[in-house]
Every structure is written in C-alpha cells, then in structure tokens.
C-alpha cells in the first residue's frame, strides 16, 4: 500500500479553499447574459468553446492533490445540479464558493463547524420555502420561449424552436438534440407512438410511390408470441373482413405459413392487412406491447393471461385513427385508448423512472413515457463550423432542461434576484446560539453573490447594483444585465425556473457545509521519479 500524506485543520481547509477558488473562478466568468466564453483544449481536434458551467468544471483537474479535492467537491455540485435541473450549474458553483469562503473565515475565528452547518441548513430551508411560495406557474407558450431563450444565453431562435417542440409533444414528450448537416436549425416532430420495426413483407405496401403501408381507422391485433399458422386466427380474420376495416398484426414474429397466407389475402384484395414484429426484447417487449394495447384501447393477447387466439373477438383489438408503416418504423397516430388508462400508465412509468438506478433503464423508460404521452421531437442544430454547432448544441441542451424544470415547478425573476429577495425570510429564523446565527449569516452573504457576479460580468459595479436592488421591496424588480436597465424582470422576460434556483442553492449548501466541517485530508504521496540513466556515449 502506497504511503499517504495527511493534512489537518487550517492547513487542510486552506488547501481545499484554493482548489475551490481555482475551479469556481474559471466557471463564474460564464454567468449571466454577458458572461464570457471559456476555451478548452482537446487532445484531438479543435479546442472547444463553451459557456456551460458544468462543462468547464468537468475539465478542471489540479496538480496538487489536496487542492484537487476541493475542486472535485465543487465539480460534484455542478454535476448534481446539472443532473437534477439541467441548468444553474454556474450559479451553484458560485454559491458553493461563497459559502465555503465565508465558512472558512468563521471556523478560523473559532466557531463550532457543526453549529455553523446547522445554521446554514436552517437558512437554506427558509429560502427554499420562500422560493416555492413566490414561484409562478408557467402557462403560455411565450413564457416557455422566454425561459428557453434565457437559458440558451439569449438565443431567440433556440427559444422559439424549444417552445414549438414542447407545444407539439407535450411536457412529457421526448425532445432529442442532434447536430444538423446544414447551416439552419430545424425541428422535426413525430406524432403518436413510433417504434423501430418495419413491415414483415414489402407485399403489404399500400402506397407504392413512398413504399409504405397507410391504414385509416384500422384494427390492431397485439400478440405476444410467434405466429406461424393462421388456423386459430380464422374466425377473427373473417370478422375483420366483414367489418371492412384494415388489420395490423403486431406479434413477436410472423413467419412461414402465417406470413404467406396474409400476403396472399392482401394481394387478392380480400383483406387489407399488414404485419410487424413487436418492438424491444424480453421483459421490455412485454411492457411495450402492453403500452401499445393501452394506447389503442385493445388487449395484449398473452397466454400468461389465459387468452387464446381462437377466442379473440373484435372488441379485444386495438383501434387507431391512422397507422403508417415503412421499411424501418411503425407509427400509430391517435390511438383509441381511454385517457384515464393512458394517464395511469404514464404515472406508473414515472414511478419506475424515479426508482431505477440504471441510466440505461431510465433512458428506455423515458422513451416509453414519451411515446405514450405524445410523441418525439428532434431539434437539429445548425451552424457555420463544427465548433459553433457543438457550442450551440450545449446551449440547446441547457435550455431544454431549464424549460422542463420551469414547467415542473414554475418560474421566478432571474438575474439572481429571487435569491436576494430570500434575505427577508432569514430574519424570521430562530437560532439556538451565536454560532448557528453565524451560519445563517454565511448564507445571507452568499445569496447576494450570484446577482453581484452577473452584474460584474456585464461590466457594472456589483455591490452598487445589489445595494440599489435591496432598497426596492418589489419582488420582481431587478437589474436586467442584457439591457443595463432596472425594471420588472418578470415582465421583461428575465426569468429563472424555480427548480433550477432551488437545486443550485441546496446542492451548493450541502457540499459547502461538508467542506466547512472537514478537519483532515488524506491523499497519496506523490512518487519521486528516479532520473533516467544517462545515454552511453556515441562512440561506444
């Protein structure tokens, strides 16, 4: 086992603080509408230019192991905030730095670190309650566009695209962001449920020009097992023929005699039919077939449930307004399932998303949720160069998460003002002793820092502007750093999602309080590398 180096008390906290400062100072220049860019060297390809706090934080690795510990702890704040809220990473980093700095001073003055932590926790709880009380629900498309624009650093085009995407696929719909091959940014929306399985045979095609199957108002048979013979299905097929409606068969596989019989019937014109394989594999396939059944108001025919194919009636089949099948995908539009059943299924999937620990499972569950809840939107981000496209794609990702967060918990005035207004909530806190009161005061000073930093990045005097803001008691009144004016920020469209502000504060306080209460640091001793032996003389 390698030898370890140990640092204690003041020495330990000083090293941590240096690391925190190095990382936070690099990140905080990006804060606000007039924040600057950070250029990151890449081991291959062009350098990356970004204004995304978490991207900058993830690139920082310090040589001194003890300083690096401090930097990594604050990097954790940015990552956690990014995971939970998708934005607010720079605000969280700035808050963490402020709390650690103020806390280190208090500990150096001889205060009890544990009481300071309790005071910090009380203050954070009071501000979070204040933020929740003042959060305003998002209702209009314009508000969504404003939030997306701000989170994309003032890019109005991105804001408009995101608002359109959310309007079309709903709040639970999946929005994916890709790099475009052209200069223009474009939006493509797939309505209804789409899964990646095409027709089992090209003979099913009804639109020869586009090589796809198009059915209006079809019946949908959802079968869990393979279909290799149609003997047991004949009564059902006769009933479908009499109804005059088309039939879509979704099964694990349709092969041999069954496929041949369906193709022959299709070509003779007696039966409008198409067959596709069921999406997914294993347990996920069962779940997706159940999703299709709920969406279309049908029943998944499964031997587990004791339903045999010969007993299936038309009432057990799903219905949809339209089905489109091409070589690779099947899209079911306007399924006839009851809204209540679909909502119950959506709630069930949401609970599974919360409980799962696997990122892969979470992603697949979110895809299923989106397919049930309304559709999938793809935003293709364009730009003149690869560097520009990557930078814009980062901003679209941020904006998308911020917009979702706003719809979830509502909005607050931006520009760091919501945190400033939380100062009043701190006055009502009752503390047990002077050290806890000092903990509350640490947060009192820290929550002024984001607003000050935004103003400084815009080239104004931070302390002067914050002083002016505190003189005015109107909740939404603040400094618009983009225009350099004092105004009602909510009316001006300078808004932040409540979830982003709340998460940034809670994550920052959580990690900063741990750093304040740190008394020892342990790291591996750097290995002394032996000098390389001298090369032999050339005439050897």
UniProtKB/Swiss-Prot annotation:
Swiss-Prot/TrEMBL induction comment: By heat shock.
Molecular functions (GO terms): ATP binding; ATP-dependent protein folding chaperone; isomerase activity; unfolded protein binding
Enzyme Commission code(s) on record: 5.6.1.7
Predominant place of localization: cytoplasm
Disulphide connectivity of cysteines: none
Enzyme class: isomerase
Compartments in which it is found: Cytoplasm
Residue numbers binding ATP: 30-33, 51, 87-91, 415, 480-482, 496
GO biological process, one term: response to heat
Swiss-Prot/TrEMBL keywords: ATP-binding, Chaperone, Cytoplasm, Isomerase, Nucleotide-binding, Stress response
InterPro entries listed in its UniProt record: Chaperonin_Cpn60_CS, Cpn60/GroEL, Cpn60/GroEL/TCP-1, GroEL-like_apical_dom_sf, GROEL-like_equatorial_sf, TCP-1-like_intermed_sf
Pfam families, alphabetized: Cpn60_TCP1 (PF00118)
Family stated for the protein in its record: Belongs to the chaperonin (HSP60) family.
Annotated function: Together with its co-chaperonin GroES, plays an essential role in assisting protein folding. The GroEL-GroES system forms a nano-cage that allows encapsulation of the non-native substrate proteins and provides a physical environment optimized to promote and accelerate protein folding.
Protein name: Chaperonin GroEL 1
